[in-house]
Amino acid sequence: WLEMMEEDVREELSGTFLEHAPLVKVSAATGAGLDDLVKEIEHQTRDEVVQKDIHTIPRLPIDRVFTLSGFGTIITGTLVSGTITKEDTLQMYPVGKECKIRSIQVHGEDKKECYAGQRVAINLSNVKKKEIKRGCVLAPPNSMKNTDLLDVKLNVLDSSVRILTNHTRLHFFTGTSEVLCRAVLLDKEEIGPGESGYVQLRMEEEVAVRRGDKFVVRFYSPMETIGGGVVLEPNPK
C-alpha cells in the first residue's frame, strides 16, 4: 500500500520542481518516521538558509488580526525584512493609517524588537480590528505604494496545461494578500507552458507592493496555479 501511495505522489509531482524531491514515510498516528523527516529537512535546508535582510525597511504582511481584552488590536505575521522596535510609528497599507507599536512578542515571549524571518505578534495603538484584514502590510510611512496596476515579468510553469491569453482573469498572491486581477499581455498574444512575458496586472482592489516583490498567479476557474514572477513597476504611468 505504501508503495502505491508513493507512486501516486511521484505521479502527481511529475513535471514540477518537486519531481525529484526525497519522500519520507511518516505516520501521523504513531509518529513513526518523524525523526527521519526532521533529519531530511535539516539536510535539505543546511545549504539553503541565507542571512535575512535586517538592514532594509521593515515589512510585515499580516495573516491574522484580533482583539485582546486590556490590550486592543493584535496582529500576527512573519517579518519579511528589516527590524521593528517597540514604540516605532509605522503605517498600515493599503489602509493608510499610522499606528504605534505598543508591544512585541516572538514565540510567546515579550521582546523590545523583532527581526526579519521571525514570527511575531504585535500590539498596535491607533488602529481598530475592523480596519485591518489579512493581506494588509505594516511598514514605515511613505515606504510603499497602494496600487491597482502592476507591470510584472510573469513565468508560466512548465507543467501548466493551459495557456495565458490576453485579459485572462487571475487570482494574484503576494505576501499574505489574495486579489483578483486581469492580465494584459504587453509583448505577445499568449504565454504558454515554460514561457515568460511582460504583463500588466489590473487589480480589482488596491494592493501594497514594492518593486522586486515576488508573486504567484492562479487561474480564476478552475483555480489552478499557472506560475509567478516579479513586480517590475508598481503603479506604472
Identify the meaning behind each predicted range.
Residues W1, E11, V127-K237:
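C-terminal effector modules of nucleic-acid-centric enzymes and ribosome-associated factors
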Residues M5:
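RNA/tRNA-interacting regions in translation and RNA-turnover enzymes
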Residues E11-S160, G197:
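Conserved catalytic-core segments of large NTP-driven translation/proteostasis enzymes
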